A protein has these predicted regions:
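Soluble "head" domains of membrane/secretory-pathway proteins
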Residues: 1-216
Length: 216
């Protein structure tokens, strides 16, 4: 997308959802769009601490703080954590038993940018396998501690694309990068500046008072 270099932290972005069929493999559905807030940019290192987003070197707030506070309140009790587990929304990307990340404590997670190189080991492969396979159109496999990409042995990998971490404003109920991973730059359609449609889920009626309101 032209102008993706202008995307900043907290911008609301519309994009083609990159995981339409399964969360471990990037695909494409031209009719499936999401709108989420940009939490982390290419080159950022992101963490989630007690449900709140943190990006190394960035001093401002990220995402909907009130919603993150509410999520932290829910997770402050074992009952709240168990409720989230039953809702299948507590454990987080990349759903690996060794990392054991969840929406309360996640990271640090580096957000790749084009030209970045990583060494292939268990943690890096778990985090970035789907990106590597999507960029190369080949399977990344492991045998006896050695990795092969499309049948060729590989020890390091250089990313060809930029990626973003996206978060929904309803932190306690949003299927975002905490669950499905990172967003490739070319899936971005543009920024969202104003609300053009708002439907009350309980009644199915249009919330006219929200139409054309500027998104902050």
């Amino acid at each position: 997308m032209p102008g993706t270099s202008d995307i900043l932290h907290n911008d609301v972005v519309i994009f083609n959802f990159p995981y339409p069929e399964r969360w471990d493999s990037i695909g494409f559905d031209v009719m499936l769009y999401y709108a989420k807030r940009c939490i982390a940019l290419p080159g950022d290192t992101l963490e989630i601490k007690n449900g709140h987003y943190r990006v190394s070197g960035y001093g401002g707030s990220l995402g909907n703080i009130e919603s993150q506070d509410e999520l932290a309140r829910i997770m402050s009790t074992e009952q709240g954590v168990q409720w989230l587990i039953k809702q299948n929304c507590y454990y987080a990307y990349p759903f690996d038993s060794l990392l054991n990340w969840n929406i309360k404590e996640l990271g640090p997670l580096y957000i790749p940018r084009a030209g970045d190189q990583i060494h292939l080991e268990h943690s890096s492969v778990v985090l970035y396998r789907q990106l590597i396979e999507w960029e190369q159109g080949a399977k990344l496999t492991e045998q006896k501690g050695c990795y092969q990409l499309g049948g060729n042995e590989i020890t390091n990998y250089t990313f060809q694309k930029n990626y973003y971490f996206m978060g929904g404003d309803k932190t306690e109920n949003s299927r975002d990068s905490r669950y499905w991973g990172l967003l490739p730059e070319e899936y971005i359609v543009g920024k969202v500046w104003r609300i053009w449609k708002s439907i009350d889920k309980s009644t199915g009626t249009t919330r006219w008072e929200r139409i054309w309101k500027k998104i902050g």
